[in-house]
Design a protein with these regions (language model features):
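A generic, lipid-embedded transmembrane alpha helix
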Residues: 14-25
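Juxtamembrane helix-capping/reentrant segments at transmembrane boundaries
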Residues: 1-15
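"…centered on the first transmembrane helix and the immediately adjacent amphipathic helix/loop
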Residues: 1-4, 20, 39, 43-44
Length: 131
């Protein structure tokens, strides 16, 4: 499935946010997990919410927002706890490859790719930092 028009992305993003909120509620009431997991989950939901708002006007890269969020989490974990620098480097390389593939496929322009990555990084770094 490929969603090329920005208008077609709104409903899938909205459904994803709803399911993540349901999952957050049930997992939070059933399982006890580390506060960092709670922060990551809320950061992902917030990132999706912002991409939903942006998508009404512009086609930001959701792929890059997701991997940017992953990079932001591990970057912050490296800063707080240490010992995950190899993951940080791996995710950064993977991010470059993903961004390159999105550009080659002409799915996004460079602004959309960089903006998506930056949004994901900033959102998840800020949420995980809130620990």
């Amino acid at each position: 499935m490929q969603i090329e028009e920005k208008e077609e992305r709104i409903l899938p993003i909205l459904f994803t946010i709803i399911w993540m909120l349901i999952g957050y509620y049930f997992l939070g009431n059933i399982l006890e997990y580390a506060p960092v997991v709670n922060s990551i989950y809320l950061g992902m939901i917030a990132t999706l919410g912002i991409t939903l708002l942006i998508t009404k006007y512009w086609k930001i890269s959701l792929h890059m927002a997701a991997i940017g969020g992953c990079f932001g989490v591990f970057l912050n974990l490296q800063y707080i706890y240490g010992g995950v620098i190899n993951y940080v480097i791996f995710i950064l390389i993977l991010s470059g490859l993903l961004g390159y593939s999105r550009a080659i496929l002409k799915a996004h322009n460079m602004q959309q790719i960089y903006s998506g990555f930056l949004l994901g990084v900033l959102m998840l770094v800020s949420f995980v930092s809130y620990l």
